[in-house]
Regions:
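Short beta->alpha connector loops
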Residues: 10-14, 58, 157
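Conserved glycosyltransferase catalytic-site signature
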Residues: 60-65, 171-178
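Short, high-confidence coil segments that cap the C-terminus of an alpha-helix
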Residues: 73, 120-124, 186
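Conserved catalytic core of nucleotide-sugar-dependent glycosyltransferases
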Residues: 86-175
Length: 187
């Protein structure tokens, strides 16, 4: 079972979009990671859900590394702080047009059950396709080995501890982490 949802956030103290879009039962699993200068205000609002990053961490790649190391003994998810959860479904008879709707509480249950099932089968990490990518009806609803917007879930106990989170151009760390894990035989 997914134990934690971690939301790294910056500059959204009073506008936690992802958190507001989660059902109440998932809000109980949420932790926010924040820069030290935002900690007190976030703590006043969200209490012990707020984790203060060390002073030396200023960018997202080191933040993601810190999150991975902090939660590496758990099954956890890492969400951006501005997510809206949308389902795209085929629109029969409309060619390439798709129907979009917001996640329901049941969609969240189904999504987490799907991820838990994948982890039980040995899949250790994965992500989501961005909503603006038009799905392929032949592969709907799941596309394997496609571009991910960001890493979304980790089965921490099954993953190596020597991932390098910031070894390339100072960006694209999610893609690089994916390649490191895939190159090491993880799926």
């Amino acid at each position: 079972m997914i134990q934690h949802i971690v939301i790294p956030t910056l500059g959204r103290t009073h506008n936690q979009i992802t958190y507001k879009n989660l059902p109440d039962n998932l809000k109980e699993k949420v932790y926010f990671t924040v820069q030290p200068h935002e900690y007190d205000e976030m703590n006043d609002i969200y209490g012990d859900k707020v984790l203060k990053l060390p002073e030396e961490i200023k960018r997202i790649a080191p933040t993601r590394e810190w999150i991975f190391n902090k939660f590496n003994d758990t099954r956890h998810m890492v969400f951006d702080d501005d997510l809206e959860f949308v389902v795209k479904e085929p629109n029969p008879g409309e060619g390439t047009k798709w129907l979009s709707r917001r996640f329901t509480d049941q969609d969240f249950v189904d999504a987490l059950d799907l991820v838990d099932g994948w982890m039980d089968e040995g899949i250790c990490f994965g992500g989501l396709l961005p909503a603006w990518v038009i799905p392929d009806v032949k592969q709907w609803p799941v596309r394997e080995n496609q571009r991910m917007m960001t890493n979304w879930f980790f089965n921490g106990p099954e993953l190596p501890r020597d991932i390098q989170w910031n070894r390339v151009m100072g960006g694209a760390e999610d893609f690089d982490v994916n390649l490191q894990l895939l190159s090491s035989g993880f799926k």
